[in-house]
Amino acid sequence: MMVTWSVSTVASCQHSCGRSRCSFENQPRLGGTIRLPARFSALKITRQQTIPRWSLSVYRLLLLILSLPGAPALAQNAIVLVGSGSSVPAPIYNRWTQEYGKQNRNIQMRYLAVGTSEGIKQISHGAGDFSAGEAQLTDKERKEGGLIELPVVLIAIVPIYNLPDVHQELRLSGEVLAAIFLGDVKTWNAPQIAKLNSEITLPSLPIQVINRPGGKGSNYVFTDFLSKVSSKFRAQVGVTASPKWPVGEAAERSSDMADKVRGTRGSIGFVEYQYAVKGSVAQAAVLNAGGRFVKASSESIDAACQAAEAPRWNNFSASLADAPGADSFPITSFTWIYLRTRSSESARTGALVDFLNWIYTDGQQYAAQEGYAALPAPLLAEVRKKVSNLR
């Protein structure tokens, strides 16, 4: 089906999004004719209408994605692939949108960060073409929702902190991190932390814990690691995208987490590596399974995947947390793209497969540039085989 949309601008934010300034303010609304899934039905979209709030209904999700600032102009009759999910991989999807769009004006992609759990819900209910996140699909989601997950790049969740008077590298183990986020370790000069940092004079500041609300992929990766290294954490919280944190205040988005920690003296939180780098916030070195304290980098993220056994690669939903190896960063994970295995729209399926083939070839070169790590070549070969079966 065809959808026509027009060009206009919004002079000020009327979205009731609660922000003092909104990214939609004074943004041009590009125009054109695009090809969308038949399930969206015929409608004429004009950007002279404003969106009342960040609704996640199918139609409003579509409107938001079509008007994302900075998106490349659409060719006539372009197929627009619509995706939503975790904010963790949002920067790499945005980069892929730009680079792929330069090469192919007939297939475009729009991605909106709404959280891992919400993204899975959207794709399960038929909204969009794919979703993305860091949580493993449940058997119910695979069977009843007809979904599969494929890894796209490697990510790391890093502990970040704000101790202005500490200039040396802070070291933390998984057990100490678990104790902090359980509320058992309450001050920065507690014996458990001091033992790992004998060369640092730690302040007697209370620890201000900052966590994430429910439905977030970074929660899943972080709790997966903490559950592997702490039996108490596993029993009290467990591996989940929606943990019931016993202490702390929540940061809604990954960028909010970096901002909160940077602005709160004595705080600790966790965020995807590239957000920590771009947010200029201090990162702790974490004790890995090889007995070394390692900081996150594209190299240490890659090392964790390389050190994992090959069967864990071939199981595309496998956990990489606490991987072996002296150089491995221990809070490493795949970030996945979630796809429906059944589609009646061959043109859209073909466009999606073309896009996937690109991200598993040319697209991988942008991973390290954006603060992630590319998938190892043997794993890429296996994933491409899976993609070829989607047609």
Identify the residue ranges that each predicted region occupies.
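Low-complexity, intrinsically disordered or signal/transmembrane-proximal segments
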Residues: 14-15, 27, 48-49, 59
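Residue-identity detector for glycine
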Residues: 18, 29-32, 70
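Bacterial N-terminal signal peptides
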Residues: 60-70
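Flexible loop/hinge segments at secondary-structure junctions
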Residues: 75-391
